[in-house]
Amino acid sequence: MSMKAPRGTVDLLPEQSIKWQFAESKIKEICHNYHYQEIRTPLFEHTEVFQRGVGDTTDIVQKEMYTFEDRGGRSLTLRPEGTASVARAYVENKLFGSPNQPTKLFYFGSMFRYERPQKGRMRQLNQFGTEVIGSEDPAVDAEVMDFAMNIYKSLGLKSVKLVINSLGDQESRESHRNALIQHFEPHREELCHDCQNRLDKNPLRVLDCKKDRDHPAMGTAPKITDFLNEYSKTYFADVMTYLDALDIEYVVDPNLVRGLDYYNHTAFEIMSEAEGFGAITTLAGGGRYNGLVEEFGGPSSPGIGFGMGLERLIMALEAENITLPIDQQLDCFVANMGDESKLEATKVVKRLRDNGIQADMDYQKRKMKGQLKAADRYQSKFVIFLGDDEIEKQEVTLKEMSTGDQSEVSMSQLVEVLQEKLNGGKIYE
């Protein structure tokens, strides 16, 4: 038995985890500003949720899902994406009955896909996503894309671009579907096995094929934008009008096709143009899904959302050499001398922590020199020296590590003095 992490998974160690925490906290600030609320759905669902929601002709459903039977014989699947689960929860919990519409939701969570592991593509991936359900308004589409772009900009990323397209409504998609079949049918035998099947079930998927993307027929395939009816054209034009009003730069790519069946009308991706990012440049993707809620038995509830991989977000930050303003310094280290002072040190550390001051102490029975080295490694801003004399006098020696200044502080005033020296921003209430 291998005592290593399974293929396609990684351990997120503290030096990386702190970057994730910073990014996640920044994202949550933006969620608050845009008035989105968090939802948490199960890690696994009934397999039918993804078969019906994502589409049984997609690569995700046919090749990439982790599906198993429980002891009751029920087919369950680890979630490969977030939107289908949110739509299921929206219907099951009757969120459509709330007077506060549209419903604006966000989520963080692990997704699972059986893919060939490579840089930026893992079998367990961590995703942030948003869903706005209950409105078919071009202004909402623009808001969602603005939201996504704002995340990258707030973290200092500059080499990102927004790419958009319209997949049209059902009528437009049907016209495009028929044109695609006519176009690719003469080349059927030249296409890969998967695309031959897709041509019958969902020819739009042929355009998203990795194996056949260099086939000459791909370059001359009919574009969805040539088949948009008046409503779809007007809707897409209105989306672009709102993007222009928000000063959001974008590129229209008529070849942009999202890999999930539920998308219609607006589709978009955010890509990195940073040198050294690698072959996989997509950071986030999303679009509109007006029929998904009905697929789960709910009322007509148009929706739009996006998902972004947190692994790729961190990769993009590293590709642009962005150093996050993370304070990794410890507020205070309590150095003690002897068993009696160690007992007192535990009480001092607890009092500091209870008042919102980050504090630590020695648990390795180090001598004073070793404890000071530990304080240096923790980049501690202050060190409290606590020995028998300090306990008897009920005062400690407080040293500011950046200047070397030392002062005697009474136990009763320690918290107040330390909070003031730490700029008074961490008072516990």
From Swiss-Prot:
GO terms for cellular component: cytoplasm. The keyword Acyltransferase does not apply. It is found in: Cytoplasm. It catalyses: tRNA(His) + L-histidine + ATP = L-histidyl-tRNA(His) + AMP + diphosphate + H(+). InterPro entries: aa-tRNA-synth_II, aa-tRNA-synth_II/BPL/LPL, Anticodon-bd, Anticodon-bd_dom_sf, His-tRNA-ligase, HisRS-like_core, HisRS/HisZ, HisRS_anticodon. Disulfide bonds: none annotated. One of its GO terms (biological process) is histidyl-tRNA aminoacylation. Signal peptide: none annotated. One of its GO terms (molecular function) is histidine-tRNA ligase activity. Its main location: cytoplasm. Keywords: Aminoacyl-tRNA synthetase, ATP-binding, Cytoplasm, Ligase, Nucleotide-binding, Protein biosynthesis. Its EC number is 6.1.1.21. Homodimer. Belongs to the class-II aminoacyl-tRNA synthetase family. This is Histidine--tRNA ligase. It comes from Oceanobacillus iheyensis (strain DSM 14371 / CIP 107618 / JCM 11309 / KCTC 3954 / HTE831). The lineage of its organism: Bacteria, Bacillati, Bacillota, Bacilli, Bacillales. The gene is hisS.
